[in-house]
From Swiss-Prot:
Binds 2 manganese ions per subunit. Belongs to the peptidase M24B family. Disulfide bonds: none annotated. The keyword Metal-binding applies. One of its GO terms (molecular function) is metalloaminopeptidase activity. It catalyses: Release of any N-terminal amino acid, including proline, that is linked to proline, even from a dipeptide or tripeptide. SUPFAM superfamilies: Creatinase/aminopeptidase (SSF55920), Creatinase/prolidase N-terminal domain (SSF53092). Mn(2+) 2 binds at residues 251, 262, 426. Keywords: Aminopeptidase, Hydrolase, Manganese, Metal-binding, Metalloprotease, Protease. This is Probable Xaa-Pro aminopeptidase GSTUM_00008071001.
């Protein structure tokens, strides 16, 4: 894994906006091979107020705009001339009234020094007749406030999404930084669990550690699910007492400069796993290790997802939750989706569920319906590997009532596992030609976790 000093050295440079613009043009050329002229036009997120209030809504930059600018300012624009290879950023001019409350904004010269662009102009410079652009304008229709005489609204968004699927060195460094901050927060939560009385206390520990280490934003709403709440995949109430619960499933990650981390660990609240919890944990850890070992450029993600199910079935047969069938038979009947209903992982980048994965949510096969990445893995992709086993009564009950599945499930044995709730283990990896680099350094071996918990 790259050292902290190397990551910081990379991030001391500029976000590579011009290279990203070239990446997008390269994808546009796949669709428009004769393209020699044209302008990419993107708008940043607008500043907004809450309804009937003068309080600003928390700002989140548009990811398409950020990818081509590295600029986190509201009410801005950019153009990229394909013919001239010129990237121009337009930022709001100084508003004397707002300086009173918010201080001086970034000047044009400061922005030119900060961002990887060729020119910085005030946004008033874009208040031009649309006929001033004689070239074809590539825009994202839903994120554009103006109409141009010649415009293409179909090609830009998919071109950016395809480009974003492959991360460069700078983007990987941002994700590594987010992971390292999240690792500090996860380990602080392990240390705090035995003295905590409520899920929200652990969420507070996690958030505090992220903010203290330079990541004030979370990549997504964290999951701090104790006991049976861990069987709800996106449980976000985070307000239940911990007393009497076996385990805590902690799925949370910091965002660093608009890039996400996404890490899950499951651990015993008391400092010791029960027999049933340890059995399930060991199965899930084996699932993850085997899936990690299979991950490399060219490997088909669908096949690795099937591998996760096969290992899960083997483990559940061993502990007796599943019975009366071979691994292949139970797999072909899709009974394992009762215990692993989600996909193995998803692309990670500026969005937690990042673009470019080519999912098919209309797939009639329940094993693949929620798989957010389909097809072969390319080198340079960052993806999560997050197998899990869950004991959710609402999900499993229909399987128990369907003879197709019920014959494979031992209800008496299953009853011993409801309180385990759910176990998920999730790391973020960079796909390489020969395998992968794990960007996540959070304890997951049982002995390592227990050292943090028990001091």
């Amino acid at each position: 894994m790259t050292s902290d000093s190397t990551v910081d050295k990379i991030l001391a440079g500029k976000y590579p906006a011009k290279q990203h613009a070239e990446n997008v043009v390269e994808r546009l050329l796949h669709v428009h091979p004769d393209l020699t002229d044209g302008v990419i036009y993107l708008e940043s997120q607008r500043s907004k107020l809450y309804e009937n209030s003068d309080q600003e809504v928390p700002f989140r930059q548009r990811r398409y705009f950020y990818y081509l600018s590295g600029c986190d300012l509201a009410d801005s624009y950019l153009t990229y001339s394909i013919r001239d290879r010129k990237l121009t950023l337009f930022i709001p001019p100084i508003d004397p009234a707002s300086v009173l409350w918010s201080g001086l904004p970034l000047s044009n010269s400061e922005a030119l020094e900060k961002y990887d662009v060729d020119e910085v102009l005030p946004t008033s410079a874009t208040a031009l007749p649309t006929t001033s652009y004689s070239s074809l304008m590539f825009v994202i229709e839903s994120q554009t406030s103006r109409t141009f005489h010649l415009q293409n609204t179909e090609s830009l968004e998919p071109a950016i999404e395809r480009a974003r699927a492959i991360k460069d060195e700078y983007e990987v460094a941002l994700i590594k930084k987010a992971n390292r901050i999240s690792a500090l927060a996860h380990h602080s939560c392990l240390r705090a669990i035995k003295s905590a009385g409520n899920e929200r206390e652990i969420e507070a520990v996690f958030t505090k550690e992220c903010i203290a280490n330079g990541a004030p934003k979370q990549a997504y709403s964290g999951i701090f699910g104790s006991g049976r709440s861990a069987s709800t995949l996106h449980y976000v109430h985070n307000n239940q007492p911990l007393a009497g619960k076996l385990n805590l499933l902690l799925d949370a990650g910091a965002e660093y400069n608009n890039y996400a981390s996404d890490i899950t660990r499951t651990f015993p609240i008391s400092g010791q796993f029960t027999k049933e919890s340890r059995e399930v944990y060991d199965i899930v850890l084996d699932m993850q290790k085997q899936c990690l070992a299979a991950s490399k450029a060219g490997a088909v993600w669908d096949d690795i997802h099937i591998l996760a199910h096969k290992v899960a079935i083997q483990g559940l047969l061993k502990i007796g939750v599943l019975r009366n069938g071979s691994v292949d038979e139970i797999l072909s009947n899709r009974t394992s989706t009762a215990f692993l209903p989600h996909g193995l992982g998803h692309y990670l980048g500026m969005d937690t569920h990042d673009c470019g994965g080519n999912p098919n949510y209309a797939d009639p096969d329940p094993m693949f319906k929620y798989l957010r990445k389909r097809g072969p893995l390319p080198a340079g992709a960052v993806i999560t590997v997050e197998p899990g086993i869950y004991f959710c009564e609402f999900i499993i009950k229909p399987y128990l009532e369907d003879e197709k599945h019920a014959k494979y499930i031992d209800k008496d044995v299953l009853n011993r596992y409801w309180d385990v709730g759910g176990v998920r283990i999730e790391d973020n990896i960079l796909i390489t030609e020969g395998g992968y680099e794990n960007l996540t350094n959070v304890a997951k071996e049982v002995d390592d976790m227990l050292k943090f918990i028990n001091g």
